Amino acid sequence: MEDFVRQCFNPMIVELAEKTMKEYGEDLKIETNKFAAICTHLEVCFMYSDFHFINEQGESIIVELGDPNALLKHRFEIIEGRDRTMAWTVVNSICNTTGAEKPKFLPDLYDYKENRFIEIGVTRREVHIYYLEKANKIKSEKTHIHIFSFTGEEMATKADYTLDEESRARIKTRLFTIRQEMASRGLWDSFRQSERGEETIEERFEITGTMRKLADQSLPPNFSSLENFRAYVDGFEPNGYIEGKLSQMSKEVNARIEPFLKTTPRPLRLPNGPPCSQRSKFLLMDALKLSIEDPSHEGEGIPLYDAIKCMRTFFGWKEPNVVKPHEKGINPNYLLSWKQVLAELQDIENEEKIPKTKNMKKTSQLKWALGENMAPEKVDFDDCKDVGDLKQYDSDKPELRSLASWIQNEFNKACELTDSSWIELDEIGEDVAPIEHIASMRRNYFTSEVSHCRATEYIMKGVYINTALLNASCAAMDDFQLIPMISKCRTKEGRRKTNLYGFIIKGRSHLRNDTDVVNFVSMEFSLTDPRLEPHKWEKYCVLEIGDMLIRSAIGQVSRPMFLYVRTNGTSKIKMKWGMEMRRCLLQSLQQIESMIEAESSVKEKDMTKEFFENKSETWPIGESPKGVEESSIGKVCRTLLAKSVFNSLYASPQLEGFSAESRKLLLIVQALRDNLEPGTFDLGGLYEAIEECLINDPWVLLNASWFNSFLTHALS
């Protein structure tokens, strides 16, 4: 750091900083961060004053170097950088000639135009925190405070920034450059952290000896002693300060800070109404697969060939009939659509060579199901400007729905293990550095915990369906293309397996914009009888299409096989994100890594191996009405993965809003649990913002009910 300071700053500034440190008895070889901070502060003070002059008319003007008017009076008197005696002499002289009130502490500059002393601050923390500390130390309304940060933020008394924007921009740019230069040499983190104040010490026990010295060294800047700092913290009155700041913003704004106590928060109000329904793009726990092991047929890997091969494994087809109609749809059309798929697949099999893709005939039932010619005709705006009552359609408010138990069951199922592996261990080259070795060890442990997880199956299924649908939407825009819903996995014995879940038929797809919608009809196999939870299947028409022999504890039993049919839609941007669902694996791995890091820093060694191999240890996985649920590390991995996958499958504006707003309340509650005595204003407004997102989305409603469980246990 010392070398960097000597290279980065003007020699005059470096010399002044050395003198200052000597005067205060500090060793610049040891206190290198302080050395850098003093140089930075000096440079900002000089830049603040540079080029600013006062002309004969008493107006402030900016004059660049080398200008013939260099005899003009300087606008600012620089006090910072002088030795203490000289500095006080200058301050006294200014007070005598201008009648200014003498400050208690040495300021940095005097402004002859505004007739006030200026305290300049340069902080590595948040500007308002540093501003508060300065204001509290000076306790004088006469001295103007101006704080700059290394991130380009600034704060000044009464938002009066003294200088023009260009001059301030020069200072901010210089600070940003210093930060980048430090970062490129690996010095920034240490420099940034060296300014941090320690947390307040609550107990009033006497601190002596080494601990006392450490306490005094650990104080935030501008505090000479622990008592001084304690007095500041105890006497800090947020209401006055925050109200003052708000009153600068607007006369209408006011905010009383209310203490947030255990009794303050209430549970979130979940909506009443009919139970919520399934809205994912494909079936989850209710899906049924027709599978082939060790596929080696001709054209293996071509979706249509694979699908036909899977269909041939089932012999229990029967005349289909509707067992659960769609309330608002024309159900015979859904029935005819399935019959058409069967017939056209049969036609393909009768051909000599199976084609690689199949476009369905544009029958009336498919046109209806895919909304063909249903969109209102678009009219050019110029042609209807004169229409008097031109207005947008009135759209009904969404109907409120209540939480139903099926979504918790879906989540539980997603956390479970299946008997197949859905992802391969990445074949990655030799580790070069030790950190890579740790990273790949963690990845391998994590992969082995989640490779058989049902949530991982949903990822691979989602990636496949979205990729196939986006490809078809671009390659066959006008066609009703038949797209098999396929996934691939490995059995316990390591044999490859190809699975067919059903089919999608894509509608017209001239997708110009990211949000343009392509309609599709999905037809998915299932053994779930829809009559058990009809509310879950509100958007579906369900057919009974066959009987399947299932191996059970009492031998083979015959179960009816259903087909869940619905009209759905998606867009380019949704398909793009669907194709990237593998990111969920990365997100949950990072969450697990941060748990390992926390454990490792406590034990001061890498705890990866112990973390995954100590089977007796349990970890918190979430809240339920019973309290905090704990489980093995594998279950934690799978639960985190399932949450990430459901955030992707059930992505919606309601979820975005709920996540952002409930997080604020969560942080306040956590602050209360950590005894940080949080205060809030407009808590009612925050509740309103959260509850505005609780409308009808099953995943959001489930998260809200989990949040209520968390509130109950966090505050009991």
Curated annotation (Swiss-Prot):
The keyword Ion transport appears for this protein: no
Protein name: Polymerase acidic protein
Positions contributing to Mn(2+) 2 binding: 80, 108
Stated role: Plays an essential role in viral RNA transcription and replication by forming the heterotrimeric polymerase complex together with PB1 and PB2 subunits. The complex transcribes viral mRNAs by using a unique mechanism called cap-snatching. It consists in the hijacking and cleavage of host capped pre-mRNAs. These short capped RNAs are then used as primers for viral mRNAs. The PB2 subunit is responsible for the binding of the 5' cap of cellular pre-mRNAs which are subsequently cleaved after 10-13 nucleotides by the PA subunit that carries the endonuclease activity.
Binding annotation for Mn(2+) 1: 41, 108, 119-120
GO biological process entries: cap snatching; DNA-templated transcription; symbiont-mediated suppression of host gene expression; symbiont-mediated suppression of host mRNA transcription via inhibition of RNA polymerase II activity; viral RNA genome replication; viral translational frameshifting
Quaternary organization: Influenza RNA polymerase is composed of three subunits: PB1, PB2 and PA. Interacts (via C-terminus) with PB1 (via N-terminus).
Its EC number(s): 3.1.-.-
